[in-house]
């Protein structure tokens, strides 16, 4: 699906989100296909139709993103992750693989919460551990709990790098991020977004870390996202197509 088609869908759904700046529109169209700086390849999107064609790419200066060269070039999907605090609450109650802890539980406890809550915090699962191939974003300069940009449904949202995958699949985010991106699809713990049209961008460097400035104790997802928006806007503005 081309960005113009996705934008049309977003207008129909009326989802509250941020408009894509021009540089991000150009990035979205430009980086689907080939990657000249492959950090690690051989991953799936959690399914079988596109094989192990997904890879972490460093072609955008100061950033890391996921893409696949299959089918002429594409990004990845958005499976729902419910790991962390309240992992069986609300729409996460039917998650077949939920765990009661995220990868950065110890770090986020410093901000007065027991762990990230997938029902509340819009986090992205980024990086792969335990199985081969592996990819550790920290090796390339990403910091735990740093701001990430997500292009979904023709719009821009901000989340944080909040978890890693124990296998070799990619394209996963918390329930609250899926609800921000695709409210019309009514995601839950066992149902996400299948199309490979979601661009996840991680940023390198400590400037991407919100720390105490993020509203970790927010009661609404939108309030948390709003608390990291200024950092996200600055990071996105610095990206070159």
UniProtKB/Swiss-Prot annotation:
Query: What's the stated role of this polypeptide?
Result: Chitosanase catalyzing the endo-type cleavage of chitosan, the deacylated form of chitin. Chitosanase may be crucial in the degradation of the deacetylated portion of chitin in the fungal cell wall. Chitoolisaccharides produced by the hydrolysis of partially N-acetylated chitosan are known to have many biological activities, including antibacterial activity, immune-enhancing effects, and elicitor activity.
Q: Does the keyword Kinase apply?
A: no
- Name the UniProt key words of this record, in alphabetical order: Carbohydrate metabolism, Glycoprotein, Glycosidase, Hydrolase, Polysaccharide degradation, Secreted, Signal
Q: Does the keyword Cell membrane apply?
A: no
Residue ranges the record marks as coiled coil: none
Glycosites: 86
The gene it comes from is: csnB
Name the chain's protein: Endo-chitosanase B
The family database entries (InterPro entries) matched by this protein are listed as: Chitosanase_fungal
Name any GO cellular component annotation.
Answer: extracellular region
The molecular function terms in GO held by this entry are:
chitosanase activity
What lineage is on file? Eukaryota, Fungi, Dikarya, Ascomycota, Pezizomycotina
């Amino acid at each position: 699906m081309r960005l113009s088609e996705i934008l049309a869908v977003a207008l129909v759904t009326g989802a509250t989100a941020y408009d894509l700046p021009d540089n991000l529109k150009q990035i979205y169209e430009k980086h689907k296909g080939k990657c000249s700086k492959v950090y690690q390849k051989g991953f799936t999107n959690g399914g079988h139709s596109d094989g192990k064609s997904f890879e972490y790419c460093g072609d955008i200066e100061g950033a890391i993103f996921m893409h696949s060269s299959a089918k002429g070039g594409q990004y990845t999907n958005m499976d729902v992750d419910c790991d962390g605090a309240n992992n069986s609450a609300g729409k996460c109650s039917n998650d077949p693989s939920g765990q009661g802890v995220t990868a950065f539980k110890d770090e986020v406890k410093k901000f007065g919460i027991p762990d990230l809550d997938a029902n509340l915090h819009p986090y992205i699962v980024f990086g792969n551990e335990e199985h081969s191939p592996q990819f550790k974003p920290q090796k390339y300069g990403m910091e735990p709990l740093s701001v990430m940009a997500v292009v979904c449904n023709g719009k821009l949202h901000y989340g944080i790098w909040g978890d890693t995958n124990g296998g070799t699949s990619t394209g996963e985010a918390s329930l609250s991020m899926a609800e921000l991106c695709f409210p019309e699809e009514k995601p839950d713990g066992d149902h996400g977004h299948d199309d490979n049209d979601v661009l996840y961008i991680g940023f390198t460097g400590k400037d991407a870390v919100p720390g105490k400035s993020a509203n970790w104790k927010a009661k609404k997802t939108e309030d948390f996202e709003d608390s990291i928006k200024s950092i996200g806007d600055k990071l996105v503005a610095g990206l070159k197509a």
